[in-house]
Amino acid sequence: MTQSSNVKTFDALFAELSERARTRPAGSGTVAALDGGVHGIGKKILEEAGEVWLAAEHESDDALAEEISQLLYWTQVLMLARGLSLDDVYGKL
């Protein structure tokens, strides 16, 4: 994969979300999700996982990539809510 300045890596996204969790900017959807707790975040993960599956079955590769990116986002929000680091997860790969 070639990288451009507008491409975000998994690690860069986690760093960005961690910073939002730490600084709590007004109007942040990430902060609102974290404040809503693990239950609400988990529901979003289930929703996004279903959308990934449906996109894989019925939509374009671009639509599938979009749905996967949303699932990765919500997975990272859940990691932050539970206090997991990337290393916690990478150690299980």
UniProtKB/Swiss-Prot annotation:
This protein's UniProt keywords: Amino-acid biosynthesis, ATP-binding, Cytoplasm, Histidine biosynthesis, Hydrolase, Nucleotide-binding
Record EC number: 3.6.1.31
Entry's Gene Ontology molecular function annotations: ATP binding; phosphoribosyl-ATP diphosphatase activity
Annotated localization: Cytoplasm
Reaction catalysis annotation: 1-(5-phospho-beta-D-ribosyl)-ATP + H2O = 1-(5-phospho-beta-D-ribosyl)-5'-AMP + diphosphate + H(+)
Disulfide cross-links: none
Source taxon at top rank: Bacteria
Pfam families: PRA-PH (PF01503)
Pathways per UniProt: Amino-acid biosynthesis; L-histidine biosynthesis; L-histidine from 5-phospho-alpha-D-ribose 1-diphosphate: step 2/9
GO-annotated biological processes: L-histidine biosynthetic process
Gene Ontology CC entries for this record: cytoplasm
First-listed, main subcellular location of the protein, grouped into a coarse class: cytoplasm
Family: Belongs to the PRA-PH family.
Protein name: Phosphoribosyl-ATP pyrophosphatase
Lineage, uppermost ranks: Bacteria, Bacillati, Actinomycetota, Actinomycetes, Mycobacteriales
